[in-house]
């Protein structure tokens, strides 16, 4: 029979572990939310500072690797397309990235984690700056995508290891998603041939087509009740009663 002291120590250790997990969840949530705010106002250096030393971003089926890759995407690609090379908010330009619906799973060792978030983007150019709108883009648009991200704790601070954004749909604000074909298409050429291209392109079997194409996004989390992680195409059998 265990002594009262050992029982108390066990309970305290269990409580400490639970508190640590809650703190980790909130730290990762705060990290991802901060990412959204920084890209809203075109702050690429701050965005890059959220990533681990060997961090990477997957965007439009291309992978941008390390600090140089992250800065090429957020500091060069986005600036060339949206802000004319300017840092910070631009008069008349709307690029709000909402980070929502998180499901975060901390690894047993507390050093890595996976997180699924939904992103919604409201974007567009006011009439005042319509001349700055890139050719081929709608003046006002919506976009939504899924993040399936990896996080790592470096020097006791949570950072983004791999941010994997999978676009789900785009919509011209005036005409709606039923009449929209995505103005962004999968990457076709790597850096340096394409000065704003990714460091590598995903294998053909992993390339993600954009709207109106639809595909299931792998889920990193276990079912809250059935305690099982479901792979793409892995559906629970129909049942006549609750399990």
Question: What are these language model-derived features?
Answer:
Residues 24-40:
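Short, aromatic-enriched amphipathic alpha-helices that serve as compact interaction elements
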């Amino acid at each position: 029979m265990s002594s009262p002291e050992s029982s108390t120590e066990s309970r305290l250790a269990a409580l400490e572990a639970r508190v640590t997990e809650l703190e980790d969840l909130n730290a990762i949530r705060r990290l991802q939310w901060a990412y959204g705010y920084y890209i809203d106002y075109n702050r690429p250096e701050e965005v890059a500072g959220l990533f681990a030393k060997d961090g990477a971003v997957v965007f439009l089926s291309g992978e941008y690797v390390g600090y140089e890759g992250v800065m090429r995407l957020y500091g060069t690609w986005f600036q060339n397309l949206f802000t004319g090379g300017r840092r910070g908010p631009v008069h008349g330009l709307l690029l709000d990235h909402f980070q929502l619906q998180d499901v975060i799973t901390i690894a047993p060792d507390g050093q890595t984690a996976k997180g699924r978030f939904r992103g919604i983007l409201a974007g567009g150019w006011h009439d005042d700056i319509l001349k700055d709108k890139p050719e081929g883009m709608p003046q006002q648009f919506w976009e939504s995508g899924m993040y399936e991200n990896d996080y790592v704790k470096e020097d006791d601070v949570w950072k983004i290891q791999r941010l994997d954004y999978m676009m789900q749909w785009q919509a011209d604000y005036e005409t709606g998603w039923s009449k929209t074909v995505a103005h962004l298409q999968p990457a076709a050429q790597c850096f340096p041939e394409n000065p704003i291209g990714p460091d590598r392109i995903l294998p053909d079997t992993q390339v993600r087509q954009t709207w109106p194409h639809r595909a299931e996004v792998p889920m990193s989390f276990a079912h809250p009740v059935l305690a099982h992680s479901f792979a793409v195409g892995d559906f629970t059998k129909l049942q006549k009663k609750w399990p």
